[in-house]
Amino acid sequence: MPEGILDTSTVILLDRLADSSQLPSTPLITSVTLAELAVGPLVAEDQLVRARRQSHLLFVEQNFDPLPFDRDAARAFGVVSSSLRRSGRKIAARTYDAMIAAIALSKN
C-alpha cells in the first residue's frame, strides 16, 4: 500500500497494533491529528495516563511531519462540510474528521 493519511484513532493505537501490514507503506498524519493528540495529556486526570499520552505525543512529533491545514484544505473543508450538511449530518460532531478529510482531498 503506498502513502496514506492515518486517522487520529489509528495513530493513537500505533504502538498497540499487532499487524501493521494494513497500514500504508508511508503513513502520513495531519496537523489536525497532532492537535487532537496534544489535548490528550492535558485532559487526563490520572498521572500515569497523562504520562503515557505525553510520551506518545512526543513519539508522533518526532516521527511524523504533519500535513498542514492550509488554504487548499480550507477550500476542501467547505466541500466536505457542505456535503455532510446536505446529507443531514451535524458537522460539529465531525469537525476534526472533516478537516482531516479536507487535507486528504487537497493533496490529491
Predicted feature locations:
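Residue-level signal for well-ordered alpha-helical scaffold segments within enzymatic catalytic domains
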Residues: 13, 39, 59, 76-79, ...
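Short, well-structured N-terminal submotif of metal-dependent ribonuclease cores
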Residues: 1-58
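A ubiquitous short alpha-helical element
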Residues: 22, 64-65
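Short hydrophobic interaction/assembly module
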Residues: 55-60, 69-72
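Alpha-helix C-capping/helix-to-loop hinge sites
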Residues: 40-44, 60-64, 84-87
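Active-site neighborhoods of divalent-metal-dependent phosphate/nucleic-acid chemistry enzymes
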Residues: 65-108
